[in-house]
């Protein structure tokens, strides 16, 4: 049964590949309407060596990235989990999207890394507060690997469930929800604030 909420939810990491897409998948499977984005200048994925990443533009389809990396070195990208991740991603949406290139309005924005949180803060300041609509901006710091993304995705679902339960009193209950979340997930440091669209 889908959660009863009117909250517009967005999850964000640097490249809209691992952490944000894991959270997107978990939230979507729980019945939430959710979007996901990256904040970087390009999509960066591990390559054959640390100094040779695979770089793509936002909007380039996950399916095409999958096919290119499979042709490049199927064994390497299967062993490091990249093909499995891209397969999941292409089942969720067409392509990675960049936060700064969209103009939708969200009630809850959850980032997975402090530099992404900072980028969203800067973007919201740049846009201005013309609509006077609050956005609850939260950073759940998740290491960028498959295992931590899985743990983080479940924790984000827990957080979104709590925020949804309190949606009618969110402004009042937001600080205590965040304090409870931090004590229940001590290995996932959080930052949070309220901005306005």
Curated annotation (Swiss-Prot):
Its EC number is 3.1.3.16. One of its GO terms (cellular component) is mRNA cleavage and polyadenylation specificity factor complex. One of its GO terms (biological process) is signaling. Keywords: Cytoplasm, Hydrolase, mRNA processing, Nucleus, Protein phosphatase. It catalyses: O-phospho-L-seryl-[protein] + H2O = L-seryl-[protein] + phosphate; O-phospho-L-threonyl-[protein] + H2O = L-threonyl-[protein] + phosphate. The keyword Electron transport does not apply. One of its GO terms (molecular function) is protein serine/threonine phosphatase activity. Component of the cleavage and polyadenylation factor (CPF) complex, which is composed of cft1, cft2, ysh1, pta1, swd2, pfs2, dis2, yth1, ssu72, and fip1. This is RNA polymerase II subunit A C-terminal domain phosphatase ssu72. It comes from Schizosaccharomyces pombe (strain 972 / ATCC 24843) (Fission yeast). The lineage of its organism: Eukaryota, Fungi, Dikarya, Ascomycota, Taphrinomycotina.
